[in-house]
Amino acid sequence: MEAVKLYEQLEKDFINPSLSDEWAVYMESVFDFISDNFKKRSMGLVCDNSQEINKVYTAVFPSNGVMRSILDKNETDIMLFVHHPSIWDIRKAPGVWQQMDTGLLKQFKERRISVYNLHVPLDNYGEYSTSVNLAKALGLEIKKPFAPYFGALCGVFGKTRFSTVQELKEKFESVVGHKTSLYQNGVDEIKDKTVAVIAGGGNSIDMLEGVAREGVSAFITGIAVQNDHSKKAHDYAKENKINILGGTHYSTEKFACMAMCQYFKKLGLSVEFIDDEPVLEDM
């Protein structure tokens, strides 16, 4: 497929003028590899290295492991689709966002491997969005979106068949494939069997206010660790008796990147999701 036609289709299907983002201000160290358009608006085509796209790989972050696994395949004229153009690692706070390795980016350019990013557009409520696909994986019946974020609505409310937070936690762990955290600030019973979901980093007062307004007592997100940055959010959750379940940034957002495989298949492209490692310290 002509690369420009693929980029145009992604633009049409996901990006609209109401959405914004700010990645470029943190990415000066890799500016030599970044497209001018991405420097201006922080979404869409990150690295313009291909005229043809024969295969797409999807991933949550462009980690060294993900980039190397693609290079090890010895393929050319392909695209890496990522939810983030940088790599999250809370263990390296305050510099939690690490940039792509320049040596690997040079090899991407030589191999004609482009990089494409949808962050806010993929967080935005829709068929392929992060929270929608996490909610689906949890077996929730999605009711409505919430949580304004850079022009998007990044969260969803859904109905669960489970009656207690403990049951929901067990389901959450089976879905993400590892232990999850629970900050139990209210009763174990899930009020009205309604759950709020924000994949990734929903542990902030702005997001929790939307949960509290609906009277919801169970909230699932990715980054839930209690630290200096999140103390006010945890205090707010305690005051409003909101139980917070955390499953890591990576594990809660991977379902959207897996769902995007179906999107690219519909365009007639060969596609593969590349799994990565969750940072358990997120919880």
Segments (PLM) and residue ranges:
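Active-site catalytic microenvironments in core metabolic enzymes, especially phosphate/sugar-handling
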Residues: 1-283
